[in-house]
């Protein structure tokens, strides 16, 4: 029995060595034909963690789970008309430029407002803009920009406005069944590899349509076929909720709207999380407003009655005054923003955070020691 077991082990080892040699030969041939790195073991990759870029909204970064939009991936932003889709995308453009990157905007709808984009923080002098004549032209331009490797973000607004050239050349009323879907399917096949290789973020804004004859379930769908749904790593559903009333002289006016952004698909973090943001008309997402709400919910900003305070110092009575204080003190805004991101695990702890935590622990130990000394003194007095 022992001899049989030993023989079996020798045969297994022999076949194992032969398979390993065959694999090594195959890898060498692949590397020779297609270049180094064509096939590699996953653990050999220099960067295994997904790189992200902030969306420009703290609440959305938290909902995305990874801290922002993943680099080298396709993002789809869709929703009803005037829900804030382009606003969300423009904040990503502004954030890209803020981090020193280059952004491009493919305006297929021919409706980009430069003044509004500038109000959101976009440097319109540095923004690459294209207003294509057809869907093929717009996607071809996007592809060339991505292939260059010099562009960090490409926004296409919108998929529904990418009209195939055959439809433009034809007459109104002509049937072009599946033409746009085939165009998008081909574009996704060509662009996906280049997007991943160059680590470019590609954001596609999309509209909503309704399926005809749907009695049960959700009749809503997005145009352009199913290819974009499959290739997108993140899909965001943007919906406007309640209107926001102004204060003071504007108390009877609508100055913005509360918007819900739902992550309906996420390949880099758990999906189905929601972000609630305030989109102010003419200003975009209120970054101070979302910071005050989130920081007060987790206790970084303390709230007592109508007063908000930070580190024992009052920063405003009412949320509007607290938002104004943070807007006037960008260094305090950045400090609180960093603490919130650390709390949700979106950024790694730095030395200052570690020192601060250590000081808090030391204080707690000292307080406990004082209490123990007082208890011992009280006991001695009672015994005497």
From Swiss-Prot:
Residues binding ATP: 79-86
Compartment list: Cytoplasm
Protein origin, superkingdom: Bacteria
Primary localization class, coarse: cytoplasm
Gene3D superfamilies: P-loop containing nucleotide triphosphate hydrolases
Matching InterPro entries: AAA+_ATPase, DNA_recomb/repair_RecA, DNA_recomb/repair_RecA_CS, P-loop_NTPase, RecA-like_C, RecA-like_N, RecA_ATP-bd, RecA_C_sf
PANTHER family linked to this entry: MITOCHONDRIAL DNA REPAIR PROTEIN RECA HOMOLOG-RELATED, RECA
Family membership noted in the UniProt record: Belongs to the RecA family.
Name by which UniProt lists this protein: Protein RecA
Organism listed in the record: Streptococcus thermophilus (strain ATCC BAA-250 / LMG 18311)
Protein's gene: recA
């Amino acid at each position: 029995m022992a001899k049989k077991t030993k023989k079996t082990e020798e045969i297994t080892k022999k076949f194992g060595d032969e398979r390993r040699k065959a694999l090594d030969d195959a890898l060498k041939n692949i590397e020779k034909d297609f270049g180094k790195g064509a096939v590699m073991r996953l653990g050999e990759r220099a960067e295994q963690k997904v790189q992200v870029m902030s969306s420009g909204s703290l609440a959305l970064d938290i909902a995305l789970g990874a801290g922002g939009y993943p680099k080298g991936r396709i993002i789809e932003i869709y929703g009803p008309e005037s829900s804030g889709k382009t606003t969300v995308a423009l904040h990503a453009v502004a954030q890209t430029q803020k981090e020193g990157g280059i952004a491009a905007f493919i305006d297929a709808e021919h409706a980009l407002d430069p003044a509004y984009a500038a109000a959101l923080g976009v440097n319109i002098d540095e923004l690459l803009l294209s207003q294509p004549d057809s869907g093929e032209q717009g996607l071809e331009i996007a592809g060339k920009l991505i292939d260059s490797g010099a562009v960090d973000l490409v926004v296409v607004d919108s998929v529904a406005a990418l009209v195939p050239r055959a439809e433009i050349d034809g007459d109104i009323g002509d049937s072009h069944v599946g033409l746009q879907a085939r165009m998008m399917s081909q574009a996704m096949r060509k662009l996906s590899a280049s997007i991943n290789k160059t680590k470019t973020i590609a954001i596609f804004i999309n509209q909503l349509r309704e399926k005809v004859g749907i009695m049960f379930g959700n009749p809503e769908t997005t145009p352009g076929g199913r290819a974009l749904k499959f290739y997108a790593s993140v899909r965001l559903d943007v919906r406007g909720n309640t209107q926001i009333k102004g204060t003071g002289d504007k108390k009877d006016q609508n100055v913005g709207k509360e918007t819900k952004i739902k992550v309906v698909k996420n390949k880099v973090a758990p999906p189905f999380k929601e972000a609630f943001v305030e989109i102010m008309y003419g200003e975009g997402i209120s970054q101070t407003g979302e910071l005050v709400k989130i920081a007060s919910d987790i206790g970084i900003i303390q709230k007592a009655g109508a007063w908000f305070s930070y580190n024992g110092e009052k920063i405003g009575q009412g949320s509007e005054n607290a938002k104004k204080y943070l807007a006037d003190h960008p260094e305090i805004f950045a400090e609180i923003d960093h603490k919130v991101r650390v709390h949700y695990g979106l950024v790694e702890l730095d030395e200052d955070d570690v020192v601060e935590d250590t000081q808090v622990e030391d204080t707690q130990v000292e307080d406990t020691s004082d209490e123990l000394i007082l208890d011992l003194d009280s006991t001695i007095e009672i015994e005497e």
